[in-house]
Amino acid sequence: MDNQHKKIKGYRDLSQEEIDMMNRVKELGSQFEKLIQDVSDHLRGQYNASLHNRDEITRIANAEPGRWLAIGKTDIQTGMMAIIRAIAQPDSF
């Protein structure tokens, strides 16, 4: 498993500092994943608590919190991958 990335075409050897930075990014990714799940759980609870309140259901539907959470999740994933790519500096597209 040592230097496993050597076997992946287009990737160079990483320094220990770069490996540590990549691990920090991965750790932050896990924290973001937990936060996104917490927000999703909150939204589900908010919706379920409002089932008998048509005005609140309409307000929630108009605000589109699920859509915005999905956009946020995708953008965070994209950002995390961009940071990883900046650290790894692969030589291919």
UniProtKB/Swiss-Prot annotation:
Q: What happens when the gene is disrupted?
A: About 1000-fold reduction in virus titer in host (strain Pa011).
Which stretches are annotated as coiled coil?
A: none
Record-annotated residues binding 3',3'-cGAMP? Q4, Y11, K26
The GO molecular function terms of this record are: nucleotide binding
Residues annotated to bind 3',3'-c-di-AMP: Y11, K26
Family statement: Belongs to the Acb2 family.
Q: How does it assemble?
A: Homohexamer in apo and 3',3'-cGAMP-bound form.
Function, in words: Antagonizes CBASS (cyclic oligonucleotide-based antiphage signaling system). Binds and sequesters host-produced 3',3'-cyclic GMP-AMP (cGAMP) with a dissociation constant of about 87 nM; each homohexamer binds 3 cGAMP molecules with 1 cGAMP molecule binding to 2 monomers. Sequestration of cGAMP inhibits the cGAMP-activated phospholipase activity of host CBASS effector protein CapV. Does not degrade the cyclic nucleotide.
Q: This protein is called what? A: Anti-CBASS protein 2
